[in-house]
Amino acid sequence: MAQKLLEKYNYPYLSIDHLKMGMIRSGNTQLTPVSADTELTMFLWPIVREIIKTVIENRQNLIIEGCYIPFDWKKDFTDEYRKDIRGYCLAMSENYIRMHFDDIKQFANVIENRLDDEDCTLDNVLKDNARTLSLAKENDLDYILIDGEYKIDMALF
């Protein structure tokens, strides 16, 4: 999705997963690629949060994508910052996951060459998406529910 937005709006994007791997490979953390998402979020979010503030203060545009953004991220920004932030959670419906699980698994490996995806089971994907959707609603976040065709045409303005 971030790549599509880059192509449409010519805005640069930052993959939080790339930041994660840079921090791990550079030795700036003892965390590993398989550390718990909660630990990785606690480590990465303060960095990402301050990048967002810097981008806004400099009146620049940046698309940030990744799963290491806490669902309660709004509490970390004043109204002045929040008015310039567009945040969306992506989730897939149970029906979509069941009908397209093989495609989901294959596409995940195309985007990020995963050495080990044994945790990418139908049950785990269903649970993760249900959790994502629930937390997005609980935190009053905008979300995109993929239910039919995976075609998202998002307007940033």
What is each PLM-predicted segment?
Residues 29-33, 80-83, 105-107:
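Short, hinge-like loop/turn segments at secondary-structure boundaries
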Residues 39-92:
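Glycine-rich phosphate-binding loop used to anchor ATP phosphates in small-molecule kinases
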Residues 18-21, 69-70, 92-98, 151:
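Conserved nucleotide-binding/hydrolysis micro-motifs of P-loop NTPases
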Residues 12, 61, 138-142:
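Residue-level detector of anion-binding/catalytic polar loops
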Residues 85-131:
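A glycine- and Lys/Arg-enriched "phosphate-lid" helix/loop adjacent to the NTP-binding pocket
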Residues 3-47:
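Conserved substrate/cofactor phosphate-moiety recognition/catalytic segment
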Residues 11-13, 84-89, 143-145:
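Conserved beta-strand scaffold positions in the cores of enzyme catalytic domains, especially
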Residues 130-157:
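NTP-dependent small-molecule kinase module
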